[in-house]
Amino acid sequence: MQAYGTNAQALTSLAGLSFPAAAAATRPLSLLNGWQSSQFAYGTGDPAYTVAGGVVYLSGSMYQPSGSSSEFAVLPPAARPRHKLWIETYTYNGAVGALEITPSGVMDAFNNTGNAAQGYTSLAAISYPVNS
């Protein structure tokens, strides 16, 4: 793990950071509606999920070069929440975006300022309890 910036040595918070502690099977997300992996441009990994210890971990990043649907994937039953989740995430140019994950597994990416979510949406460091 690395921390960057001139103040990183003074304070680097790890609050909210989580990842699977043991090796667990990572599964690719099948992207829909023109959404594509941003791995080639940013080296962030292809969009994927891992279920370990009752927690779902998302990873990778994506963008949507064409199309207008915010729906980008559908999770399998073993990785779905019990209730609708809204989770903040990083989108293009530092804009704050959100993921909506429904009990049926539908995953959507949004942001309030134009089409930043379509330009880039990160799934890194997003996790939630299974059946949450």
Positions of PLM-derived features:
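Glycan-recognition and catalytic regions of carbohydrate-active enzymes
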Residues: 35
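Extracellular jelly-roll beta-sandwich "head" domains, especially the C-terminal globular C1q domain
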Residues: 1-31, 40-45, 64-74, 81-132
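Extracytoplasmic/periplasm-facing segments of secreted or lipoprotein envelope proteins
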Residues: 39-55
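Short, well-ordered beta-strand segments enriched in hydrophobic/aromatic residues
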Residues: 54-62
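Short low-polarity hydrophobic stretches
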Residues: 56, 76-77
